[in-house]
UniProtKB/Swiss-Prot annotation:
Annotated protein name in UniProt: Small ribosomal subunit protein uS2
Record's compositionally biased regions (Low complexity): 264-275
Family: Belongs to the universal ribosomal protein uS2 family.
Species for this entry: Xanthomonas campestris pv. campestris (strain ATCC 33913 / DSM 3586 / NCPPB 528 / LMG 568 / P 25)
Chain segments annotated as coiled-coil in the UniProt record: none
Region (Disordered): 226-275
Gene Ontology CC, one term: cytosolic small ribosomal subunit
A Pfam match: Ribosomal_S2
Signal peptide (UniProt feature, chain positions): none
InterPro entries attached to this UniProt entry: Ribosomal_uS2, Ribosomal_uS2_bac/mit/plastid, Ribosomal_uS2_CS, Ribosomal_uS2_flav_dom_sf
PANTHER family cross-referenced by the UniProt entry: 30S RIBOSOMAL PROTEIN S2 PROKARYOTIC AND ORGANELLAR, SMALL RIBOSOMAL SUBUNIT PROTEIN US2M
GO biological process, one term: translation
NCBIfam families registered for this protein in UniProt: rpsB_bact (TIGR01011)
Alphabetical UniProt keywords: Ribonucleoprotein, Ribosomal protein
Amino acid sequence: MPQVTMRQMLEAGVHFGHQTRYWNPKLAPYIFGARGKIHIINLEKTVPLFNDAMNFLSSIAQKRGTVLFLGTKRSARESIKEEAERCNMPFMTQRWLGGTLTNFRTVKQSVARLKELEAAETDGTFEKLVKHEVLGLRREREKLDASLGGIKEMNRLPDAIFVIDIGHEDIAIKEAKKLGIPVIAVVDTNYDPALVDYAIPGNDDAIRAVQLYARAAADAVLEGKAAAPNSASVREEEFSAEAGDEGKGRRAPAKKATEKKADAPAAAPEAPAAE
């Protein structure tokens, strides 16, 4: 798991919240205090929640799942795109199109159109058309690429969504919640952490803070991918095990124990999600 220290968070300005008059009382447990009418986030509580979120992202990637990186606000676009591309995950950095998740079949049709236009531009089809037709098709391609280019290789719904600003991406979060897709998100002092599955209390505006979140998320995904079992080696092990069983022949069934085993102690309950 990527290690992000409290000092790194301080240097990136993760602890700076919004003005006190805009606060959401449900984030009160994660607020240290106020300075100059600005809420200060308690990083001692942010760090463990941040680590939990990164562990979850890593586990998704380890199972060969897909994480959609989402950041359409100006301060997040560059970092989200760069880090999503680094870990080879889909992303959206322009305006969220309503129904991207809940009407995914229609979105896939638009993506297919984008791929068709890209192929036509490279295979010489455009050269056979008149100039004004080519200009119209290129404008269509550019428009589709701006809105859907980051998800054109996403062939199914994502297994999780990583979000920078839950207020800015409220429509996407509602769609994910409706479909049961887990949401990992940075939550500033003016929002309710209960709206997402894995809340990271922190500054969602500062560019350096956004870079820190996106970089850590990409690192978590890459670590998860590296830890994923090799499908070829797994099949080879299964084949070897089956061959070994055939060579040994059937074993006699084990005799039942005369004494009952003591019940195993119940597993400790997981800590409840932060609200």
